Structure formats: structure tokens, C-alpha cells
A protein has these predicted regions:
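Structured, basic alpha/beta domains of bacterial-type, RNA-associated proteins
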Residues: 2-9, 24-142
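Short alpha-helix boundary/capping segments
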Residues: 12-16
Length: 142
């Protein structure tokens, strides 16, 4: 029996669902907001909020746990680990490393939500998608 098992299956197998949520979470943390279907947005919300909660802890184990849940791709910006500043281009004379989604999550996003106890994302309804009339949504970091 499946009593009290609450998750959105999205009509996909478990491995496909995990890959989809990882991809959506990575894009959400990269751009701050994404446009997707309502069902995917509702499935992404608890997934992304759990990752932000891990980032707020900030220890090594939390970093390793969060690395399992997102793709650690580069964002195209540069990061100064000493001052935690983000630069658009590499500057001369500074030790800059390329900013990845995981670094952005633990350095920038976790500090923004340090005083907040949940509710890190919001979902806006959008007009239905043209073609198949699927309910669309905009999910963004608060």
C-alpha cells in the first residue's frame, strides 16, 4: 500500500524524474527564475527548498549532499573566494575562479536566505501554452 507517500511522479520513471528535477533546480539556481509547466513547478518547489536548506548549513557534508542534487556547471561568471564577490569578466591581478552553480548556491544564495525559515520559492501562474493548452508557471527564488 502506498499510504502517505507524497511525491509528484510527473508521468516518468524514477531515473528520468531525478534527472529532470536536477536539471530544473540547476537552471533555477543559475537564473533565479524559470518558466515551466505547473506540475513541474510544483514538483520542483520542495526539491529546491531542500537544497537551499542544505546550503544554509554550509558545512562540508551539506556541500556534498547538495552536489548530488544539482548539476555543477559553470555560470559564465567569475568568483573571488576571499571577498565572495562575483565578476562578469576575469580581472588582472585578482585570483578568480570560475563560478559554478554549487559555489553560487553556497556563497550567494545561502546568505540571502540566512534569516528566512523556508518559503524560498514562489510560483506564478502564466497563460496556457499555445499548442497543447498546458498550464504554465513561473517559479522564482523569492
Amino acid at each position: 500500500m502506498r499510504h502517505q507517500t507524497k511525491k509528484h511522479t510527473l508521468g516518468k520513471a524514477q531515473d528520468q524524474r531525478k534527472a529532470l528535477l536536477r536539471s530544473l533546480a540547476t537552471e533555477l539556481f543559475t537564473y533565479g527564475e524559470i518558466k515551466t509547466t505547473m506540475a513541474r513547478a510544483k514538483a520542483l518547489r520542495p526539491y529546491a527548498e531542500g537544497i537551499i536548506t542544505l546550503a544554509k548549513k554550509g558545512d562540508l557534508n551539506s556541500r556534498r549532499q547538495a552536489a548530488k542534487f544539482i548539476f555543477d556547471k559553470e555560470t559564465g561568471k567569475f568568483f573571488d573566494p576571499e571577498t565572495s564577490k562575483v565578476y562578469e569578466t576575469a580581472e588582472e591581478g585578482k585570483k578568480l575562479v570560475s563560478q559554478t552553480v554549487l559555489r553560487k548556491l553556497f556563497s550567494t544564495i545561502s546568505k540571502e536566505y540566512s534569516e528566512r525559515n523556508g518559503g524560498y520559492t514562489r510560483i506564478f501562474r502564466l497563460p496556457p501554452r499555445r499548442g497543447d493548452a498546458t498550464d504554465m508557471a513561473l517559479i522564482q527564488l523569492v
